[in-house]
Amino acid sequence: MAGRAVVKGVGHYLPERVVPNAAFEKTLDTTDEWIRSRSGIERRHFAAEGETTSDLATRAAEAALADAGISAEQIDAIVLATSTADLTFPSAATMVQARLGMTNGYAFDVQAVCAGFVYALSNANALIVSGQAKRVLVIGAETFSRIMDWTDRSTCVLFGDGAGALVLEYEEGEGTPQDRGILSVDLNSDGRYKDLLYVDGGVSTQTTGHLRMQGNQVFRHAVEKLAQTAETALDKAGLSSADVDWIVPHQANIRIIQGTAKKMGLPMDKVVVTVQDHGNTSAASIPLALSVGKARGQIKTGDLVVTEAIGGGLAWGAVVLRW
């Protein structure tokens, strides 16, 4: 027998404001066709004025709790992945904890940029299998619209705001790859590449700053590293690409998504794709895609799912789980 962290509920929230590609034609030297052809993105959601990352996270958390059929008081811990917390401190996770009316347990943020949700899943899994928590609420939430340079057409058209959440719960499994729950994790980072994707602000500068990215270099690293980490995670679970029902990748760019699937030898009809509707929502993109994939009827109980992501740091990783 082996303890597993099993998905019991999933949910997401998107701000009401939808911004199509055409909206950028008024202020930037760009077109809808240019954005679509290079990224696959057609539209994205932006938070309203005064709407914060913790607001989005709370709405997604409420949806996941409802899907799981449990109350916030039954949660032992909250792990929230974000790079755009409302304040330097306290954590966005503690803000969500308060808004959910959860007075027990503990809550903390994880920051690994676009790889954040994979890192958060790893943390939540460790809490559960080590006996430190029975139920963990795992959230990815971002308001990247707050750190965009609206004069930089190479970045500002790519990102969106949103949140997604999972409820993980301890269950006994047989200790085989047929168990439901998280089967394996692979995490990596290499700080030598920190200048490829970063924000030029923070406490040391006393400014919020804006996102800066060397897109071509990020793309070059992304496909190679994403396929590698996914295959490593599968190998750790005693599985291979042939066993995969769904890849649920970080939704950064359709060309990265396609390139990774091809490198893994998997057809695109085994990939959950939401980038066209949400843009790159950083740490929110994987839980958003998991929630949408379930709602579409793509992801079903018993399916083998691989999530993989790469972000600033560079940081990257993958999680293999049976839904």
Swiss-Prot record:
GO cellular component, one term: cytoplasm
Domain of life from the UniProt record: Bacteria
Keyword Lipid biosynthesis tagged: yes
Region described as ACP-binding: spans on this chain: 251-255
Keyword presence, Coiled coil: no
GO biological process: fatty acid biosynthetic process; secondary metabolite biosynthetic process
Subunit structure: Homodimer.
Protein's job: Catalyzes the condensation reaction of fatty acid synthesis by the addition to an acyl acceptor of two carbons from malonyl-ACP. Catalyzes the first condensation reaction which initiates fatty acid synthesis and may therefore play a role in governing the total rate of fatty acid production. Possesses both acetoacetyl-ACP synthase and acetyl transacylase activities. Its substrate specificity determines the biosynthesis of branched-chain and/or straight-chain of fatty acids.
HAMAP family: FabH (MF_01815)
Protein name: Beta-ketoacyl-[acyl-carrier-protein] synthase III
Organism: Ruegeria pomeroyi (strain ATCC 700808 / DSM 15171 / DSS-3)
